[in-house]
Amino acid sequence: MSMQDPLADMLTRIRNAQMAEKPVVSMPSSTLKVAVAKVLKDEGYIAGYQISSEVKSSLSIELKYFEGRPVIEEVKRVSRPGLRQYKSSDDLPKVRGGLGVSIVSTSKGVMTDRAARAAGVGGEVLCTVF
């Protein structure tokens, strides 16, 4: 069975692993997933990530906890295959008054909503993280 929404699968695996207090979560790798993992690491939501290139490449994400609680409190998929969400740089959503981040796929790559506003580019709002 093929996966319909690989990014939603990635976010669900992260959410489930954090609820089970796992230190690392693994999943099939893709270019988009690696780009999202890089943004999550740069923003401090995960401790790190690693790509292993065996027969099928897999992405391992090292989860981050603070005082026994997951750093990521909420992660939501915004744009989905059935309803894509494209926003201009002026209309990009702020998550919880700027405390969280929206991850946006732009023509200049995958970046946070703040970076996209600074670059003056819009794009597809992939997910929100708080």
From Swiss-Prot:
> What InterPro entries does its record include?
Ribosomal_uS8 (IPR000630), Ribosomal_uS8_CS (IPR047863), Ribosomal_uS8_sf (IPR035987)
GO BP terms in the entry: translation
* GO CC terms: ribonucleoprotein complex; ribosome
Task: Give the stretches traversing the membrane.
Answer: none
| UniProt keyword terms in alphabetical order | Ribonucleoprotein, Ribosomal protein, RNA-binding, rRNA-binding
* PROSITE patterns, A to Z: RIBOSOMAL_S8
Q: Which Pfam families match?
A: Ribosomal_S8
Q: Does the keyword S-adenosyl-L-methionine apply?
A: no
Single GO molecular function: structural constituent of ribosome
Q: Which HAMAP family match?
A: Ribosomal_uS8_B (MF_01302_B)
Q: Which family does it belong to?
A: Belongs to the universal ribosomal protein uS8 family.
How this chain assembles, per its entry, is: Part of the 30S ribosomal subunit. Contacts proteins S5 and S12.
What does this gene product do?
One of the primary rRNA binding proteins, it binds directly to 16S rRNA central domain where it helps coordinate assembly of the platform of the 30S subunit.
What name goes with this protein?
Small ribosomal subunit protein uS8
Originating organism: Pseudomonas syringae pv. tomato (strain ATCC BAA-871 / DC3000)
